Structure formats: C-alpha cells, structure tokens
C-alpha cells in the first residue's frame, strides 16, 4: 500500500517538474520569436511606408467645398517686390519724388511702404552682364530696341530660368553639349564666340583645329551669348577670354519669381520656341509703348495679376552665383 502511495507521489512530482520545464521552454521560445519579430520590425521600419491609423473621427460637411488659403491675401505683407527699369525712365520722368509717388500707389494695391524696391539699370547690355534679382518677386521692364532684340531674348531666357553652370577651360579641352538643355553661356564686355565641330578622329569638320580663322563664328562682340550647337559632337572653341567668360550650363527649369515686361515694339519677344523652355508667356508680357509715367501706372494697376502668375522663391540671382548654381 505504501509503495503505491510513494509511486503516486513520485509520479505527481515528476509530472509537475516536467510541466514546469515544458512551460519554461515554451516561454523561452515565445520570447525568442517575439523579440526576433520586434527586432525585424525595428530594422525594417525606416524603409517601409505604412498608413498610421489613429482614432476614427467622423468628417462632417462636404469634402468638395473650396477653402480659401488663409495666407493668400497676406502675400504682400511678408514679401518684397523689385521693379527693374532703365535709366531713361528716370531721365524722362525727371521728378525727384517719383519713387515715393509710386510707393504710395503700390500701397493702394496692398504693398506696404518699404516692400517695393526700384532698381535702375543703365541698359540691357550692362544688366545682362550683372543681373541681380534679390527680391521675393522681380519684375523687369525692358523697352524694345530692334538693335538689341537678340540680347533681350537671351537676357529673358537667362533670368526666366534657373541654370547650373561650371567653368570651361577651352585651351585644354574639347566640349560637347549632351542634350537640348545644355548650353554654353558667355558674359562680358565683348564676347565673340567661334566653334569648330570635330569628327571621331578629332579632326575639324569644315574647319582646321589649328586655325581659329576657319572656325564658324556664332556670336560677334555681344555682352551675353547663349550658344547652342549640335548635341553629342565635340567642339573646339575660340572665345575672346580677355573680355568674356564662358560657362557650361544646364537649364534646370523655370525661375518662377521673375517676370519680364516688354515695353513697346512691333515684334513680341518669345523664348518659348526653345524645346527646353516650358510655356512662359504668362511671365513674359508686353505693354504698348507710352510715356514712362503711363508704363508705371499700368504696372501698378496690374501688379496683382502679374504676381498671381509668379511663385515666391528664396533663391537670388547675381552674376557670381549664376556661374555655379542659380
């Protein structure tokens, strides 16, 4: 009898010990699985994009309702506007207080006194050599001149777009343009650009690489030149480096905080023919030639419409920054 009781107790104890061992083993296995799973989740979470589900709040009202931007009407309170005009405008107006008058008129359109800056430039040529567009919004007035039509078009292409540029060493290297957005931009007091296309043996095509007089002249004594050649073909260049600097540039896209207003002229400047130029007619405008007072009155009257087709940008443009990143 006692032997049976001892056997029963011993069997019970062994069962308890075995159960405890099994439970501990299961606990260790579950801990391993859980911690390994959490570890994998932590490692992969930076590389995954998942929806973060929160409290399910009911949405009342129509989702199609148009809500006005609360800052849209306050644009002028925190922004600056630069108005660039030629010297002849100030000469014709001949009034020492004309800027104050215009500032008061801009105030009636929502631009506080001190937020509008009047920037004078001597002529298109000098402005193209050293463009300085520092304001949130920049409006450039260019009076049409048939003799400067090319410079005006290239200046518009320069300031209405952003460019990434690098220096060129034309004495050591041949250069080629990789695509239509790749241009060579030259600036200086007098830029004469000659090019000689090369074949795969680096021999001149229709020119002699050792004789610059046989090169094809693409620009003569200009202040600003945007040179476009056949893509994928090496070229040897001859540039008047004493009075001109040339850069290898890539057009990145539109500079949306700049607008150009052509004043007068029977021909309308249009740079949208370039396949790399997105339609920019909204930021390149024209008004009929009148007295300069009337021109400025027109700009003030339509400043709201002009600004609406522009976008505020923080990146400025000057001739130094232009060469590297605009």
From Swiss-Prot:
Print the keywords alphabetically: Calcium, Capsid protein, Disulfide bond, Glycoprotein, Host endoplasmic reticulum, Host-virus interaction, Metal-binding, Outer capsid protein, Signal, T=13 icosahedral capsid protein, Virion
Report the domain of life of the source organism. Answer: Viruses
Return the annotated region ranges for LVD motif: 237-239
Which pairs of Cys residues are joined through disulfide bonds in the record? Answer: 82-135, 165-249, 191-244, 196-207
Q: What is its main location?
A: virion
Q: Which residues are glycosylated?
A: 69
Annotated positions binding Ca(2+) 2: 177, 228-229, 231, 301
- MF (Gene Ontology): metal ion binding
Give the subcellular location.
Virion; Host endoplasmic reticulum lumen
Q: By its UniProt entry, which Gene3D superfamilies does this protein fall under?
A: Glycoprotein VP7, domain 1 (3.40.50.11130), Rotavirus outer-layer protein VP7, domain 2 (2.60.120.800)
Give GO BP annotations, semicolon-separated. Answer: receptor-mediated virion attachment to host cell
Q: Where is this region: CNP motif?
A: 165-167
Q: What's a Pfam family in this record?
A: VP7
Q: Which HAMAP family match?
A: Rota_VP7, Rota_VP7_A
Describe its partners and assembly state.
Homotrimer; disulfide-linked. 2 Ca(2+) ions bound at each subunit interface in the trimer hold the trimer together. Interacts with the intermediate capsid protein VP6. Interacts with the outer capsid protein VP5*. Interacts with host integrin heterodimer ITGAX/ITGB2. Interacts with host integrin heterodimer ITGA4/ITGB1. Interacts with host integrin heterodimer ITGA2/ITGB1.
Q: What does this protein do?
A: Calcium-binding protein that interacts with rotavirus cell receptors once the initial attachment by VP4 has been achieved. Rotavirus attachment and entry into the host cell probably involves multiple sequential contacts between the outer capsid proteins VP4 and VP7, and the cell receptors. Following entry into the host cell, low intracellular or intravesicular Ca(2+) concentration probably causes the calcium-stabilized VP7 trimers to dissociate from the virion. This step is probably necessary for the membrane-disrupting entry step and the release of VP4, which is locked onto the virion by VP7.
Q: What is this protein called?
A: Outer capsid glycoprotein VP7
Tell me the organism.
Rotavirus A (isolate RVA/Monkey/South Africa/SA11-H96/1958/G3P5B[2]) (RV-A)
Q: What are the leading ranks of the lineage?
A: Viruses, Riboviria, Orthornavirae, Duplornaviricota, Resentoviricetes
